[in-house]
Amino acid sequence: MSFSAAQVDTVRSNWCSMTADIDAAGYRIFELLFQRNPDYQSKFKAFKGLAVSALKGNPNAEKHIRIVLGGLGRILGALNTPELDVIYKEMASNHKPRGVMKQQFKDMGQAIVTALSEIQSKSGGSFDRATWEALFESVANGIGQYQ
């Protein structure tokens, strides 16, 4: 799926505001993901056996959260370019062995959209939920085609 220049600008702008406090945003994303999908926590080696409340301050959790958010940053940087397909293939290859499939990417997208919406609401910034939802549908489909 291709996104308009305005949509790309919107998601990148929202992303930049989130990265101002990336640790807090990352913890919120995973808190939402695991509250909604408790069984997903076992798919993350760094989070296994941790209470969701214990993610903050855990160096293994922090490291993995930054890896996940870094991957999303790569996707946003590659929107509407051929590089995006390369990233999708890599993510599919990295996640399939752990049973992380298209649905899990959709669910992660929902957690990210909710967290970003909260962050934008607190900062008074605009948030185009429909564009973000379309983006994560596209991401899940893009990765899913290689699984």
From Swiss-Prot:
PANTHER family: GLOBIN-LIKE PROTEIN. InterPro entries: Erythrocruorin, Globin, Globin-like_sf, Globin/Proto, Mb-like_M. Belongs to the globin family. It comes from the Eukaryota. Pfam families: Globin. Adapted to the low-temperature environment by a decrease in the oxygen affinity via an increased ligand-dissociation rate. At 2 degrees Celsius this hemoglobin has an oxygen affinity similar to other hemoglobins at 25 degrees Celsius. Gene3D superfamilies: Globins (1.10.490.10). Heme b binds at H64, H95. GO terms for molecular function: heme binding; metal ion binding; oxygen binding; oxygen carrier activity. Residues 2-147 form the Globin domain. Keywords: Heme, Iron, Metal-binding, Muscle protein, Oxygen transport, Transport. This is Globin. GO terms for cellular component: extracellular region; hemoglobin complex. It comes from Aequiyoldia eightsii (Antarctic yoldia). Homodimer or homooligomer. The keyword Nucleotide-binding does not apply. The keyword Repeat does not apply.
